[in-house]
């Protein structure tokens, strides 16, 4: 039986690409798409949606996720902006409803592997900085992927305070790790995690050329979320 899917934010750039690609997935049925003016809860109920893919805005994503869960569907969220406290609240709601949810800063399998390998490298290299580069239309900075990478590396290190540099050109500190953000036309999605030690450096880099690089991860999440009864944060926890 096919999984009934709604795309919330279907008129956005990511929503349109998901719509174009989902028709090739025989086990995923696109039953509706919603935007700002639509009643999301009513749409979930009338279409009997199993999964709602959310690519909306940082300002609305938490409210959207609560609506999805309370309406009995499973959120697959690629929108950035959720805090760890909000993710914990959503997880509690999922467990109460016995519904799965997936929140992923990046659905690209290559980007997720970059984060995973960076976490492993942090065992051996205590000094690290992150450079993330995106197209000029990207709203948030640092990117959700860079913040998640810093969190994962931070798990492997003794805690460091996020004290800002006196020189702001040195970047923003997350989990004790400097992050440098670049926004330019001609770029899409690129991140380098650069480790340094005596006499050597190690760079782990991922380059996403267009939004299609996230499609396998998104569709995998739509299938995996049906097996869960709690929230999973990060696609790396599904690989």
Swiss-Prot record:
NADP recorded as keyword: yes
Gene Ontology process terms (BP): diaminopimelate biosynthetic process; lysine biosynthetic process via diaminopimelate
Localization of this protein: Cytoplasm
Pathway: Amino-acid biosynthesis; L-lysine biosynthesis via DAP pathway; (S)-tetrahydrodipicolinate from L-aspartate: step 4/4
GO MF assignments: 4-hydroxy-tetrahydrodipicolinate reductase; NAD binding; NADP binding; oxidoreductase activity, acting on CH or CH2 groups, NAD or NADP as acceptor
Record's catalysed reaction(s): (S)-2,3,4,5-tetrahydrodipicolinate + NAD(+) + H2O = (2S,4S)-4-hydroxy-2,3,4,5-tetrahydrodipicolinate + NADH + H(+); (S)-2,3,4,5-tetrahydrodipicolinate + NADP(+) + H2O = (2S,4S)-4-hydroxy-2,3,4,5-tetrahydrodipicolinate + NADPH + H(+)
Chief localization: cytoplasm
Catalytic residues (positions): 134, 138
EC class name: oxidoreductase
UniProt xrefs under InterPro entries: DapB_C, DapB_N, DapB_N_CS, DHDPR_bac, NAD(P)-bd_dom_sf
EC number: 1.17.1.8
UniProt keyword list: Amino-acid biosynthesis, Cytoplasm, Diaminopimelate biosynthesis, Lysine biosynthesis, NAD, NADP, Oxidoreductase
SUPFAM superfamilies: Glyceraldehyde-3-phosphate dehydrogenase-like, C-terminal domain, NAD(P)-binding Rossmann-fold domains
Residues that, per the record, bind NAD(+): 9-14, 78-80, 104-107
Function: Catalyzes the conversion of 4-hydroxy-tetrahydrodipicolinate (HTPA) to tetrahydrodipicolinate.
Similarity comment: family membership: Belongs to the DapB family.
The protein's name in its UniProt record: 4-hydroxy-tetrahydrodipicolinate reductase
Organism: Coxiella burnetii (strain RSA 493 / Nine Mile phase I)
Organism lineage string: Bacteria, Pseudomonadati, Pseudomonadota, Gammaproteobacteria, Legionellales
């Amino acid at each position: 039986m096919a999984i009934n899917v709604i795309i919330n934010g279907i008129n956005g750039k990511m929503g349109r690409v998901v719509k174009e690609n989902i028709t090739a997935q025989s086990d995923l049925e696109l039953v509706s798409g919603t935007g700002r003016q639509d009643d999301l809860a009513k749409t979930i109920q009338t279409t009997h949606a199993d999964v709602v893919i959310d690519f909306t805005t940082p300002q609305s994503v938490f409210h959207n996720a609560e609506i999805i869960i309370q309406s009995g569907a499973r959120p697959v969220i690629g929108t950035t902006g959720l805090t760890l406290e909000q993710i914990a609240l959503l997880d509690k709601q999922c467990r109460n409803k016995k519904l799965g949810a997936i929140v992923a800063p990046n659905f690209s399998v290559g980007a997720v592997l970059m984060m995973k390998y960076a976490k492993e490298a942090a065992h051996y290299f205590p000094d690290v900085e992150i450079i993330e580069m995106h197209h000029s239309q990207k709203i948030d900075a640092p990117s959700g992927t860079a913040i998640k990478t810093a969190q994962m590396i931070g798990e492997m290190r003794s805690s460091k305070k996020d004290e800002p540099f006196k020189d702001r050109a040195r970047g923003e500190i997350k989990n004790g790790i400097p992050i440098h953000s670049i926004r330019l036309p001609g770029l899409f999605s690129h991140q380098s995690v650069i480790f340094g030690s005596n006499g050597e450096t190690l760079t782990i880099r991922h380059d996403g050329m267009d939004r299609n690089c996230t499609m396998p991860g998104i569709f995998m999440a739509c299938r995996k979320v049906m097996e869960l009864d709690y929230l999973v944060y990060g696609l790396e926890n599904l690989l």
